[in-house]
């Protein structure tokens, strides 16, 4: 993938392949029928329940990686739900945040010229340690695909790891350091964000505690398309 100029600031470096989702199983696998009728097994880079987005018969796009060492040549990247493309590759948001930090995607993170990935904090790892003229800040990133109406929600299942990250960020903030949590809303049809209390009540409670402690929440919207990804700015937080 590479940078692109124009309306989509981030473009896929090679064309994606269109198909139709036939099934998803064993969390990591998906049966897809390509446009030419070929039936293939694709890697599903999302181990969560994919609430509301794993719809059999829906159009999908796959990236193709024909390297001999790979067991599966195709990776499922996005699915179309109610006319909206939703990014499902959970490995992409962290890479795009890293990429976007260099290109001014996040005005809230201006003043940080250096970043370190996967920083140990207590017994956990935080995605980024940012440093620069603005000081230092710890930043955790969460991929968000579940939506009810125009509201994005996270998580869509109980996440003890996510709970621990919130506890760590609260502790970081209590120590006087800046702490941020960026929810990567991987679809363009959401204008609001809320914690997924229905699926993980404890996470929702910790989310509110983190807000009160001064942890900065950035529910960041993007528009996903078969050619690339465009930043849309922040959604409104609803608690």
UniProtKB/Swiss-Prot annotation:
Cross-referenced InterPro entries: SfsA (IPR005224), SfsA_C (IPR040452), SfsA_N (IPR041465)
Signal sequence coordinates: none
TM segment ranges: none
Domain of life: Bacteria
GO molecular function annotations of the record: DNA binding
Family: Belongs to the SfsA family.
PANTHER family associated with the record: SUGAR FERMENTATION STIMULATION PROTEIN A
Protein name: Sugar fermentation stimulation protein homolog
Organism the protein comes from: Synechococcus sp. (strain JA-2-3B'a(2-13))
